[in-house]
Amino acid sequence: MKKNTLSAILMTLFLFISCNNSGKDGNTSANSADESVKGPNLTEISKKITDSNAVLLAVKEVEALLSSIDEIAAKAIGKKIHQNNGLDTENNHNGSLLAGAYAISTLIKQKLDGLKNEGLKEKIDAAKKCSETFTNKLKEKHTDLGKEGVTDADAKEAILKTNGTKTKGAEELGKLFESVEVLSKAAKEMLANSVKELTSPVVAESPKKP
């Protein structure tokens, strides 16, 4: 959900809440009639929407970081910057590239560790576990990946999800992608459901007996 849309929703909620609060100081009979009708709890819904959107934005940051690893793997392994062609071939010198991928993986873990939401706890924990497993795999393979002359083959096994063999991290990276995808979908659904509560039908209570 776009930030402008969320801001508009929250502003509308604020106006509704303000109007509801001001009505309580007015006519008693009018208040009694109003209280017999139950609409959505706007204060509660406002918090749900704000919290849901914060989680979704954080997950999108993680998705962007993952995409950067994907982009590096697809386009930068075995390459160097060329003044005319953009990227030119330079095989088997991928040490700095792998160090960058590792740095991004630790940032992903940091972002996921900061996520807190009871409704998404299971999916957040699953993504955290996959993130930690991927980062640890890169560290475990430091003999092959922690040097300047990392071969193209080893680099692909570490961070290219579509590579034939994935023994140095690519398999774990694929699972991390999947877990974050599941988390993102759940976060979007949670936000959509919170917004839907705004349109919940008003329920009239049975009049109280004198």
UniProtKB/Swiss-Prot annotation:
GO terms for cellular component: cell surface; external side of cell outer membrane; membrane. The keyword Lipoprotein applies. A lipid is attached at residue 19 (N-palmitoyl cysteine). The keyword Signal applies. Residues 1-18 form the signal peptide. Changing residue 167 to D: In strain: 2591. A lipid is attached at residue 19 (S-diacylglycerol cysteine). It is found in: Cell outer membrane; Cell surface. InterPro entries: Lipoprotein_OspC, OspC-like_sf. Pfam families: Lipoprotein_6. Gene3D superfamilies: Lipoprotein, type 6 (1.20.120.240). Induction: Expressed variably in vitro in strain B31; detected in immunocompetent infected mice at 10 days post-infection but not after 17 days. Not expressed in the tick midgut of unfed ticks, expressed in tick midgut following feeding on mice (at protein level). The change in expression is at least partially due to a temperature shift, expressed in vitro at 37 but not 24 degrees Celsius (at protein level). More highly expressed at pH 7.0 than pH 8.0 in vitro (at protein level). Transcripts are most abundant 7 days post-infection in infected mice, but continue to be expressed for at least 21 days. Disruption phenotype: No observable effect on growth in vitro, infects ticks normally, required to infect mice. No change in ability to colonize the tick midgut, no change in bacterial migration to the tick salivary gland. Loss of infectivity in mice, including SCID and NOSCIDg mice (deficient in T and B cells, functional natural killer (NK) cells which also lack complement C5). About 40-70% more uptake by murine peritoneal macrophages and human macrophages (B.burgdorferi strains B31 and 297 deleted); no change in uptake by neutrophils. Whole bacteria no longer interact with human plasminogen. Changing residue 63 to Q: Wild-type virulence in mice, no antibody response in mice, colonizes organs like wild-type. SUPFAM superfamilies: Outer surface protein C (OspC). A major immunodominant protein in mammalian hosts. Required for the initial stages of mammalian infection. Interaction with tick I.ricinus salivary protein Salp15 protects the bacteria from antibody-mediated killing in vitro and in vivo. Inhibits macrophage-mediated phagocytosis of the bacteria. Binds human plasminogen; this probably confers an extracellular protease activity on the bacteria that allows it to traverse tissue. Binds human complement C4-B, which may inhibit the complement cascade. Experiments in mice suggest it may play another role after initial infection. The causative agent of Lyme disease, the bacteria has an enzootic lifestyle. Larval ticks are infected with bacteria during feeding on infected hosts (mostly mammals) which retain the bacteria during subsequent developmental stages. It is transmitted to the next host when it is bitten by ticks. During tick feeding (which can last for several days), bacterial migrate from the tick midgut to the salivary gland where they are transmitted to the host. Homodimer. Binds human plasminogen on the bacterial surface, also binds human plasmin. Interacts with tick I.ricinus salivary protein Iric-1. Interacts with human complement C4 beta chain (C4B); whole bacteria bind to wells coated with C4b. Binding is inhibited by human complement factor C2. Belongs to the OspC lipoprotein family. This is Outer surface protein C. It comes from Borreliella burgdorferi (strain ATCC 35210 / DSM 4680 / CIP 102532 / B31) (Borrelia burgdorferi).
